[in-house]
């Protein structure tokens, strides 16, 4: 039985031709079939979710089936990841993503781009992950400041049939801004597009590959409109010589890159429907959403130095939709035929899953309503989850008010029982709660700067015990705990070491005399607060329009 139906087919022809002369190892007038499979933004999802969706066991079955199909047609497969293996699922986070990397080995990944979340841990952890991985972790634009040398392999070379394929890795230069500054004291992220130009030239002069692909973790922004984010794949493709890459396998923005029109993605892509990838400057750009929800499949034909895409599809990995029947009952129904889980993978990952679950499933409290932590809320508006987290930090530190990046809130908690797993999904980064004692004047300056952080970015701030009206770069009617700020008074503010050391572009506090690092991990602080405050009444934490922008 064939696992796949063809997706977007022959209408998607494009041509990739190397600008330089290559040492021809391929046969003239022979057509070579190359299939590039890709995922990105895995974020710890080695195991299926509670609805039986995605997971590496089903992914392996899918990939194995494609490999068999392609081999039967005389073709070859390359499997790439756009990065961010780390951070998002507690069972993975507590084990430094060891199950994820070992599972990726079994699936048969060939290479991955290093993502910004690979730096959520110290570099020593990433070096251990490199040892677990039987495939290269690539980034051409990450350098050690003190030596000026690259920290990782910039590219990897693969032989498929008679073809030499080069894969370049590139990482968003936002990493130093959105990651933990304490981990970047000797690390520099150079402009990816500039490094890509250099690496392509070097490859063409030295290795002379037949095909060059970029595996990136930079983000896809329609028409290159990246806002406060660093430039992404579209901008890079436009900056490179036309057709200098066959394709960009992307990540970071966590989108299904399926175009509705030129320079405009589909807003609500439906799993299992046709997907046309983006094309900029003769370069295909693909991205497979997140978490292993899809495996992207790009089928190419290479003939006489020309690379043509003949088919593209996003293949759902057991994704389901919620259906409500006439009797009011609902269930989750597969979009596409079920993919069986590979039992060898289940055997490999079960011990990791069981070890993690044992630590995480114990009830720590309960809530009478939903605590809102979804990405499309915490980066745009104040939420009750933000208030709860900051209440916990104020409680631990005795602070008058608290601030943090909305991007540090990673999940919601539904009404009902709360486990430590729920808490760790909300705050997976292991940041430390800190506080700073500041004069009222310093508070005014700090909050004025933070209030300029724009919505639709991880930097958008969540506030507690703060009220103001922001207009024209100034704060009007600024109050702490309902009282006007006294410039001569001393106030204590709680936040995370991430923000206090300049993360997300926030003003630095760690060099101030009144700065204290408590040593308490954020998730542990939230857990303890929930335990002592349970059952939680969500109305207590509901924002009431205290902060506004005009």
UniProtKB/Swiss-Prot annotation:
Residues 1-25 form the signal peptide. The keyword GTP-binding does not apply. It is an enzyme of class 3 (hydrolase). Its cofactor is Zn(2+). It is found in: Periplasm. Keywords: Disulfide bond, Hydrolase, Metal-binding, Nucleotide-binding, Periplasm, Signal, Zinc. Substrate binds at residues 375-379, 498-504. Its EC number is 3.6.1.45, 3.1.3.5. This is Protein UshA. The gene is ushA.
């Amino acid at each position: 039985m064939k696992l796949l139906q063809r997706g977007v087919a022959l209408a998607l022809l494009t041509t990739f031709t190397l600008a330089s002369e290559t040492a021809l190892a391929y046969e003239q007038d022979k057509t070579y079939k190359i299939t590039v499979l890709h995922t990105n933004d895995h974020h710890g999802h080695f195991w299926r979710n509670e609805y039986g969706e995605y997971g590496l066991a089903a992914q392996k079955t899918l990939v194995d089936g494609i490999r068999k199909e392609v081999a039967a047609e005389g073709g070859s497969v390359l499997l790439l990841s756009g990065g961010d293996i780390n951070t998002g699922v507690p069972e993975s986070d507590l084990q430094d993503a060891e199950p994820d990397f070992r599972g990726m080995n079994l699936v048969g990944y060939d290479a991955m781009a290093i993502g910004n979340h690979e730096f959520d841990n110290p570099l020593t952890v990433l070096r251990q992950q490199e040892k677990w991985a039987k495939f290269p972790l690539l980034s051409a634009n990450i350098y050690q400041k003190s030596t000026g040398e690259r920290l990782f392999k910039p590219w990897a070379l693969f032989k498929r049939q008679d073809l030499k394929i080069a894969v370049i890795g590139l990482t968003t230069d936002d990493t130093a801004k959105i990651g933990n500054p304490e981990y970047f004291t000797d690390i520099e992220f150079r402009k990816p597009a500039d490094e890509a130009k250099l690496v392509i030239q070097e490859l063409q002069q030295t290795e002379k590959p037949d095909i060059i692909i970029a595996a990136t973790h930079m983000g896809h922004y329609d028409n290159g409109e990246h806002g406060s984010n660093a430039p992404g794949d579209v901008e890079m493709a436009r900056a490179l010589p036309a057709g200098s890459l066959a394709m960009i396998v992307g990540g970071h923005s966590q989108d299904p890159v399926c175009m509705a029109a030129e320079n405009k993605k589909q807003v609500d892509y439906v799993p299992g429907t046709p997907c046309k990838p983006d094309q900029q400057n003769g370069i295909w750009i693909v991205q497979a959403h997140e978490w292993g929800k899809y495996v992207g499949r790009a089928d190419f034909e290479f003939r006489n130095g020309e690379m043509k895409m003949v088919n593209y599809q996003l293949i759902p990995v057991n994704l389901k939709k919620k259906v409500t029947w006439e009797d009011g009952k609902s269930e989750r129904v597969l979009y596409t035929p079920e993919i069986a889980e590979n039992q060898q993978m289940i055997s490999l990952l079960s011990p990791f899953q069981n070890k993690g679950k044992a630590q995480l499933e114990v009830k720590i409290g309960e809530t009478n309503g939903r605590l809102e932590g979804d990405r499309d809320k915490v980066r745009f508006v104040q939420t009750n989850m933000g208030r709860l987290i900051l209440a916990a930090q104020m409680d631990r530190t005795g602070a008058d008010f608290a601030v943090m990046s909305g991007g540090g809130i990673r999940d919601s908690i539904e009404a009902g029982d709360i486990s430590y797993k729920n808490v760790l999904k909300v705050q997976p980064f292991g940041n430390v709660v800190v506080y700073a004692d500041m004069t009222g004047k310093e508070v005014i300056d700090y909050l004025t700067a933070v209030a300029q952080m724009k919505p639709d970015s991880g930097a958008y701030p969540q506030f507690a015990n703060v009220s103001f009206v922001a207009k024209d770069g100034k704060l009007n009617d600024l109050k702490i705990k309902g009282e006007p700020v006294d410039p001569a008074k001393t106030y204590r503010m709680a936040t995370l070491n991430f923000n206090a050391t300049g993360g997300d572009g926030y003003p630095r506090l760690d060099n101030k005399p009144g700065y204290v690092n408590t040593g308490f991990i954020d998730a542990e602080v939230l857990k303890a607060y929930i335990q002592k405050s349970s059952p939680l009444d969500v109305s207590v934490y509901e924002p009431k329009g205290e902060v506004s922008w005009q």
